[in-house]
Swiss-Prot record:
Disulfide bonds: none
Binding residue positions for 5-amino-6-(D-ribitylamino)uracil: F22, A56, F57, E58, T80, V81, I82, F113
Protein name: 6,7-dimethyl-8-ribityllumazine synthase
Listed pathway(s): Cofactor biosynthesis; riboflavin biosynthesis; riboflavin from 2-hydroxy-3-oxobutyl phosphate and 5-amino-6-(D-ribitylamino)uracil: step 1/2
Classification via InterPro entries: LS (IPR034964), LS/RS (IPR002180), LS/RS_sf (IPR036467)
GO molecular function, one term: 6,7-dimethyl-8-ribityllumazine synthase activity
Enzyme class per UniProt: transferase
GO cellular component: cytosol; riboflavin synthase complex
Protein source organism: Lactococcus lactis subsp. cremoris (strain MG1363)
GO biological process, one term: riboflavin biosynthetic process
Catalytic activity: (2S)-2-hydroxy-3-oxobutyl phosphate + 5-amino-6-(D-ribitylamino)uracil = 6,7-dimethyl-8-(1-D-ribityl)lumazine + phosphate + 2 H2O + H(+)
Amino acid sequence: MTVFEGNLTTGNAKYGIVVARFNEFINAKLLAGALDALKRHGVQEEQIDIAWVPGAFEIPLIAQKMASSDKYDAIICLGTVIRGSTSHYDFVCSEVSKGIAHVSLNSNIPVMFGVLTTENIEQAIERSGTKAGNKGFEVAVGAIEMVDLMAKMS
């Protein structure tokens, strides 16, 4: 029996990060967490590119653009969608998650889902570096592991 498992080894892997500007006060913390994780695991600044997009809905398009460039070993998608009083939240969350999954499956590279989908601002704050940790950090660690796993399986 063969068991494949990714390790937290980075080598020369290149990472693209797509960050939504809407809810920037939360997303900047997610980005800081992602950058912290990558750097702690030996990724150099020249191995990281960051693209800012207007909102979460635009994340999949730029993730696809990055993935199709063949420059990146993984794409990290960061954003925050907070429930409001209309159904807009449900549509945005659904389309962003589908779009990110679509990019990953069609590009054959890890496209990591670091988009917070919360009921309120307090939950978003908790998940961007306080009580519930920093999801940006967690997603970046997952990206490192997935890059290594993909390399082992090729």
